[in-house]
Amino acid sequence: MRAIVQRVKESSVSVDGKTIGEIKKGFTVLVGISKDDTIEDVKYLKKKVVNLRVFEDENGKLNKSLKDVDGELLIISQFTLYGDCRKGNRPSFIEALGGEDAKKLYLDFIDMCKEEINNVQTGEFGADMLVSIKNDGPVTLMIDSKKEF
């Protein structure tokens, strides 16, 4: 399971011109799910996301987590995180998990995040979405449950 975590001042997602999720201070998390992912990968990713210490403390150090600052989450599914661009110019997505299996793990991730974060907003799984992000920092991190990077 992979995620791009972006610290944001605000972020929103729209489908067909209608805003379906928006947050203020927190993280926008783009989530990709692979064919090899299980509930253990979901647990790993959730633990990392909610506990990442990338918000400033009173001394200006990146020392506070999303939970510490009562931050918000906007979670967006993005199978293209498993795009393999090493060969040719057209990405291959054969490592991405598709359909209902991917949707279930995505929803499990959302549910687990909701257990610890007060405001969790989401995109629409499988939809064509317009995501607006106002990066803060910018602070952008890549997380892989298989620790490939």
Swiss-Prot record:
Cross-referenced InterPro entries, in alphabetical order? Daa-tRNA_deacyls_DTD (IPR003732), DTD-like_sf (IPR023509)
What positions carry the motif Gly-cisPro motif, important for rejection of L-amino acids? Answer: 137-138
Q: What does this protein do?
A: An aminoacyl-tRNA editing enzyme that deacylates mischarged D-aminoacyl-tRNAs. Also deacylates mischarged glycyl-tRNA(Ala), protecting cells against glycine mischarging by AlaRS. Acts via tRNA-based rather than protein-based catalysis; rejects L-amino acids rather than detecting D-amino acids in the active site. By recycling D-aminoacyl-tRNA to D-amino acids and free tRNA molecules, this enzyme counteracts the toxicity associated with the formation of D-aminoacyl-tRNA entities in vivo and helps enforce protein L-homochirality.
Q: EC? A: 3.1.1.96
Sorted alphabetically, the keyword list is: Cytoplasm, Hydrolase, RNA-binding, tRNA-binding
Q: Which GO terms describe its cellular component?
A: cytoplasm
Listed GO MF terms? D-tyrosyl-tRNA(Tyr) deacylase activity; Gly-tRNA(Ala) deacylase activity; Ser(Gly)-tRNA(Ala) hydrolase activity; tRNA binding
Subunit description? Homodimer.
Q: Does the keyword RNA-binding apply?
A: yes
Q: Which gene encodes it?
A: dtd
Respond yes or no to whether keyword GTP-binding is given for this record: no
Report the Gene3D superfamilies cross-referenced here. D-tyrosyl-tRNA(Tyr) deacylase (3.50.80.10)
Q: Which reaction does it catalyse?
A: glycyl-tRNA(Ala) + H2O = tRNA(Ala) + glycine + H(+); a D-aminoacyl-tRNA + H2O = a tRNA + a D-alpha-amino acid + H(+)
Q: What is known of its domains?
A: A Gly-cisPro motif from one monomer fits into the active site of the other monomer to allow specific chiral rejection of L-amino acids.
Q: Which Pfam families match?
A: Tyr_Deacylase
SUPFAM superfamilies recorded: DTD-like
Using the UniProt record, give the first listed, main subcellular location. cytoplasm
Q: Which family does it belong to?
A: Belongs to the DTD family.
Among the record's GO biological process terms, what is one?
Answer: D-amino acid catabolic process
Q: Where in or outside the cell?
A: Cytoplasm
Full protein name = D-aminoacyl-tRNA deacylase
Query: Could you name the domain of life of the organism this protein comes from?
Result: Bacteria
| Leader peptide range in chain numbering | none
